[in-house]
Amino acid sequence: MTSVHTLPDITATPAWDALRKHHDRIGDTHLRQFFEEDPDRGRELTVTVGDLYIDYSKHRVTRETLRLLVDLARTAKLEERRDQMFAGVHINTSEDRAVLHTALRLPRDAELIVDGRNVVADVHEVLDAMGEFTDRLRSGEWTGATGKRISTVVNIGIGGSDLGPVMVYQALRHYADAGISARFVSNVDPADLIATLADLDPATTLFIVASKTFSTLETLTNATAARRWITDALGDAAVAHHFVAVSTNKRLVDDFGINTDNMFGFWDWVGGRYSVDSAIGLSVMAVIGREAFADFLSGFHIVDRHFQTAPLESNAPVLLGLIGLWYSNFMGAQSRAVLPYSNDLARFAAYLQQLTMESNGKSTRADGSPVTTDTGEIFWGEPGTNGQHAFYQLLHQGTRLVPADFIGFSQPIDDLPTAEGSGSMHDLLMSNFFAQTQVLAFGKTAEEIAAEGTPADIVPHKVMPGNRPSTSILANRLTPSVLGQLIALYEHQVFTEGVIWGIDSFDQWGVELGKTQAKALLPVITADNSPAPQSDSSTDALVRRYRSERGRTS
């Protein structure tokens, strides 16, 4: 059943108007004043979910702001929409699909009937098949064509079939315990595949081809080249020993030469950017094992249950989504920095870029009408402390408002002492975490700088205005469960914002036209004869120059 969101324009509601007037009153208030007037703010404007301690006190909001934002969420019927998603209602209206990434992490004894099927049973059937396969791979029972054990799995996919597995593998690679490593190929640029395979042995390499339809151009182009690399070294019969598929298209998988017994499926109610906890995560399970992967899924479920049951006033994803909307629609912010103080989360910001920007980068509401306010936050970031020596200057003293999410851990996976002997390198890392959130919020005044004896002409250059907002997310250690909790925390923020904006956060029509046009242009740039003129003079000139530099008739 399709559920069409028919709410009126949210920007024309009393709840929106109340927030606008509230912003007029408090929008310029400094965080210093908020903390002076409310000394307990730093302890009270926090929420704990699972293993995540979330401090949102350094945001330019008051308790009244939060109350008004929750009123806005209720006006948009967020709770009703959330319940529809968890129940399997077709809330992806443009594609008439349920949205059930949350079902991927339901426990085995749960039941969820959607379109006449218990999807939980289907999910665990695939998880069991993945587990049996990875057990064979990790034990050495599964071998390559020459009888050697597999030591490297190469995931070939793009978009959600790549960004999620890459990020999770890097974050959890310390949990590898069976002598298997993973690599990832996504770009159709041949340099990607060539560099990945350069030092690998075909006899000990297994490819996972991840494509729901098994027809994604970039993925199949890379997979075909990888198959040629295997067959040139080991013969045609080796394909069945060195390739498995994550797909739903048995015919094309079989045509490729992969035994369909080694095909792991997923469903149209799982969007690519929400799929790392499905069979798309097979490369991760192969490295960390089925038990650690189950812990990963359990982390998602912890936050799912919180999002589903906690009152909006204390619901972490809802509050963070509402605060993001406050900055986007009332404070003029356009982007959010994601700053993990963990090198293991180096790819987390890139992962969130797809999750958030492909979901909420929309200019049309679910009912087909144009939006009446800005939508979609631009996500970007790098791990600390690297970012401090790159772009934090703009965060501290620039003219743009950039709310930031700081993510850190009390216990490192590995640690080393500092040369000075005062704590460890991890302590040094986290001292920067705490210092940056503090300085962003409170800054340093001209009077304070002058009092240090700074020359008068230098004082203006050293003023740190502060009032730069941030969220601090602190967990004990980066474990599979904690990573699942972090991902789900952001998934449900995306949902919260999308519901209030009235958009469909689960389609991505904006990526389709470019792919179609690329297919049309490929024969134009490769044909032997001179091509017909393109519809615009810029593309025509570019194509002709490219053809000329490739030695083709222009």
Curated annotation (Swiss-Prot):
EC number annotated for this UniProt entry: 5.3.1.9
Active site residues of this protein: E358, H389, K515
GO MF term set: carbohydrate derivative binding; glucose-6-phosphate isomerase activity; monosaccharide binding
Pathway of action: Carbohydrate biosynthesis; gluconeogenesis; Carbohydrate degradation; glycolysis; D-glyceraldehyde 3-phosphate and glycerone phosphate from D-glucose: step 2/4
GO annotation terms (biological process): gluconeogenesis; glucose 6-phosphate metabolic process; glycolytic process
PROSITE patterns recorded: P_GLUCOSE_ISOMERASE_1, P_GLUCOSE_ISOMERASE_2, P_GLUCOSE_ISOMERASE_3
Any one GO CC term of the record: cytosol
Catalysis performed (reactions): alpha-D-glucose 6-phosphate = beta-D-fructose 6-phosphate
InterPro entries for this protein: G6P_Isomerase (IPR001672), G6P_Isomerase_C (IPR023096), Phosphoglucose_isomerase_CS (IPR018189), SIS_dom_sf (IPR046348), SIS_PGI_1 (IPR035476), SIS_PGI_2 (IPR035482)
Record keywords, A-Z: Cytoplasm, Gluconeogenesis, Glycolysis, Isomerase
Record keyword DNA damage present: no
Biased composition (Polar residues): 527-540
The family this protein is said to belong to: Belongs to the GPI family.
Role summary: Catalyzes the reversible isomerization of glucose-6-phosphate to fructose-6-phosphate.
Protein name: Glucose-6-phosphate isomerase
The species this protein was found in: Mycobacterium avium (strain 104)
Gene name for this UniProt entry: pgi
